Amino acid sequence: MAGPRGALLAWCRRQCEGYRGVDIRDLSSSFRDGLAFCAILHRHRPDLLDFQSLSKENVFENNRLAFEVAEKELGIPALLDPNDMVSMSVPDCLSIMTYVSQYYNHFTSSGQAAASPPKPGKDPAPPSPTSTSPAVQPGEEAQGDDLSPDSLSEQGKQQPPSSACAACGQRVHLVQRYLAEGRLYHRHCFRCRQCSSTLVPGSYSSGPEEGTFVCAERCTRLGPGSRSGTRLLSQQRQQPAAAEAKDAEDNDPSLSVAAVAEADRLQASSEVQFHTPTKPPLPSKPQELASPPGGRPTPAPRKASESSALTPPTPRPRSSLQQDGTVEQSVSSGLVNGRLQEPPVPKPRGTPKLSERMAAPRKDPPWITLVQTEPKKKPAPQPPSSGPGPLSQAYRQVEDGGLEEQTQKSSGTEPEPKPYNPFEEEEEEEGEPAPPVPSPSLAPPVPSPSPAPPVPSPAPAPSEATPKSLHPWYGITPTSSPKTKKRPAPRAPSASPLAIHASRLSHSEPPSATPSPALSVESLSSESSSHTANAEPLEPPAVPKSSSDPAVHVPGTPGTSGNSVTPSANSSLSSSGELGQPSGEQMLQARTKGSAGTHSTKPFSGATPTPFLLAGDRNPAPPVGSASPQLQIKSSCKENPFNRKPSPSASPTVRKATKGAKPVRPPAPGHGFPLIKRKVQADQYIPEEDIYGEMDNIERQLDALEHSGVLLEEKLRGGANEGSEDDMLVDWFKLIHEKHLLVRRESELIYVFKQQNLEQRQADVEFELRCLLNKPEKDWTDEDRAREKVLMQELMTLIEQRDAIVNCLDEDRQREEEEDKMLETMIKKKDFQREAESDSKKKGKFKTIKVLKFLGNKREAKSKAPGDKS
């Protein structure tokens, strides 16, 4: 016979051809022993089962093997029960057709949403004794006559297979069948009682009432009443509507359309009423994970940008169905043969987590004094050519009353500068590391194009202009290095930086202006060679530096000539009583070295040292009047205290004094490092709200398909003429295939949801374990050791569960790739056949005699050509 049934029957015969004991006569009793299912599976996937070991008499095992292999390996849900195949002498024809159609769709057009068995034409011709299907062989016509148009109606009048739901006891239609652990359910009955999500084998438990279930993943994370019970009530209202439509159709066929429309209207109204508020709220964080223990260190941000960008990154958009079959996964299939157990309740990510993370940087964490990364130096921006800049402002401060009073006054009046982030990335710098400063409140440079009051700095002092020729390392500095190195030492914990500089300034100014004998001969000789009005002005809290002129010079290289000191600089130097010296720079050097009394680069106890200049800074500074360079204040750099190298020129007494001012060091280098929590937000991360929304959309589509499928099944079993039955069968196969794709997508979303939760929980367990291991082992208690064992065991369980999900999804992807290759090969074969047919048509236009005459004429012309030449 022609039509979808005949085409499906012919396809089954071709697949089972040559297999022992398999004879496909119809789509009912021929499949009872299960060998036909196994033969189709073995034809396409011989690696899945051994067909030679099967016996025709073992009906139950054959069917069980075929159904389990198709469900676990191919993602085809089992619509049939092996017990029904044993108990019934003639299985239900519509059930067999529906199940075999999924084999057909899987092996011929996998991934195509609208795929269905081939239909001869849109309007099939009326049946005639001689009409046969193109795919049916000559001997198949008599066998196809057994499948009369009313065969489905006859089977519908017979006793249907055991289709009672194990949960509610009502009849289960084919489109509603859901087999789980050997029991038959309605799809809407096999749901979580609280969150109404489809259950996955191995991840649910019995509910409070008999026949109900509770999932171990979502219901514990959703608020009460968010999605509970609404789906069941909707289904209960839809079933009477379908029954009323069926009764009305039996009584009066003209009322069937109105009944279907009424049922659809009731379904739509129930969906609007019950599914509008189904957007679940953000899950709340479990109480035991809400806040870290009191003794746990606060996780440190890697960069400054990460501390401000606390919101999770926006995930990549992905399509709703990903071509209707990205991952083929059956809902009823377990996670790798049931290896996945109930995972612990994972820690959700959401708004509470962000608030918790935002509260951490408000206080100074303990690790800020332990390890500080060394920032790199940025080049100073090019200042404008007009305006005196901060340099003359600093000189006016000395002229009006000295830097000491201004510093003391600003310590109580000026606002505290912006905290400097030690993790900010800057350019690579050169130089030997100096003593670090673990101070988290150092201000970065704030260049300003207009005159502004000087920014308070942890290291403003007149002695910053001291030449660094005294240090033995700076005499060999190459001339190509334009960078300067400025590193203050640690400050006293109890004193503010400005108060320290004020006290130091008062101690470092001797009453006499005579140079100190500690002044080096090298610096005096170099300064005497450049004494012609090139005295370096008193430095404000920053070292003058131009982006165009390098700040490093060879000691013998003369400075820039023709530069004069600004009037403000002269007045400030004269008011300080230092104009009697040959050079203002010598006087500054003498005054500073007179107070220090040594060549040590270490500062006094409790004081912040002045940053060192390179050897070239003994020469005059760049021109101030012509270029007007802005002075740039640079915050002190930080380094790891465990990589500290003492200066070789530091005296033991100064070194001891500096140690007294350091903060308390950690007990051992192995403990106390900052613990950074691993981020788990990947590009493939899907927010929970999106997962919930897509699953709700899928459930609504499944409800609509099931409602249409119940009505269509009743029509098919009720009987119809051959033409309308063929059309209904095509619609039926398409409906089953669409439902199968939606179920696979829903199963994939459930696995993605579980995978993300397990990954988040693993990150939490790892961080808690690191915090525990970060504690010295001598301070461990019995409770800590027991907690370590529990965390290690939980970590191993989480890893195994994640591995099971990943392996399951990978197998689905590999299977889908193989199916895509098969489909591509089939398409290529069809294209090749079309090309061959077109070539044969083109060849038919030429007659053989004409071609032979044409070739003979060409040969004669070639043979005559040499004779003509001769």
From Swiss-Prot:
What cellular component GO annotations does this protein have?
Answer: adherens junction; centriole; ciliary membrane; cilium; cytoplasmic side of endosome membrane; late endosome; late endosome membrane; recycling endosome membrane
Identify the Pfam families for this entry: bMERB_dom (PF12130), CH (PF00307), LIM (PF00412)
Q: Where is the composition biased (Acidic residues)?
A: 423-432
Q: Which keywords has UniProt assigned to this entry?
A: Cell junction, Cell membrane, Cell projection, Coiled coil, Cytoplasm, Cytoskeleton, Endocytosis, Endosome, LIM domain, Membrane, Metal-binding, Phosphoprotein, Protein transport, Transport, Zinc
Mediates the interaction with RAB13 and RAB35 and intramolecular interaction with the CH domain: annotated span: 659-870
Matching PROSITE patterns: BMERB, CH, LIM_DOMAIN_1, LIM_DOMAIN_2
Q: Where is the composition biased (Basic and acidic residues)?
A: 354-365
Q: Which GO terms describe its molecular function?
A: cytoskeletal anchor activity; identical protein binding; metal ion binding; phosphatidic acid binding; protein-macromolecule adaptor activity; small GTPase binding
A GO biological process this protein is involved in? slow endocytic recycling
Which residues fall in a compositionally biased region of kind Pro residues?
A: 117-129, 433-461
Where do we find the motif NPF2 here? 640-642
What is this protein's function?
Lipid-binding protein with higher affinity for phosphatidic acid, a lipid enriched in recycling endosome membranes. On endosome membranes, acts as a downstream effector of Rab proteins recruiting cytosolic proteins to regulate membrane tubulation. Involved in a late step of receptor-mediated endocytosis regulating for instance endocytosed-EGF receptor trafficking. Alternatively, regulates slow endocytic recycling of endocytosed proteins back to the plasma membrane. Also involved in cargo protein delivery to the plasma membrane. May indirectly play a role in neurite outgrowth.
Question: How is the quaternary structure described?
Answer: Homooligomer. Interacts (via NPF1 motif) with EHD1 (via EH domain); the interaction is direct and probably recruits EHD1 to membranes. Interacts with EHD3 (via EH domain). Interacts with RAB35 (GTP-bound form); the interaction is direct and probably recruits MICALL1 to membranes. Interacts with ACAP2; the interaction is indirect through RAB35. Interacts with RAB8A (GTP-bound form); regulates RAB8A association with recycling endosomes. Interacts with RAB13 (GTP-bound form). Interacts with ARF6 (GTP-bound form). Interacts with PACSIN2 (via the SH3 domain). Interacts with DPYSL2.
Query: What does the UniProt entry state concerning the protein's domains?
Result: Probably exists in a closed and an opened conformation due to interaction of the C-terminal RAB-binding domain (RBD), also described as bivalent Mical/EHBP Rab binding (bMERB) domain, with the N-terminal calponin-homology (CH) domain. The conformational change is regulated by RAB13 and may modulate MICALL1 interactions with functional partners.
Name of the protein in question: MICAL-like protein 1
State the organism named in the record: Mus musculus
Q: Which gene is this protein's source?
A: Micall1
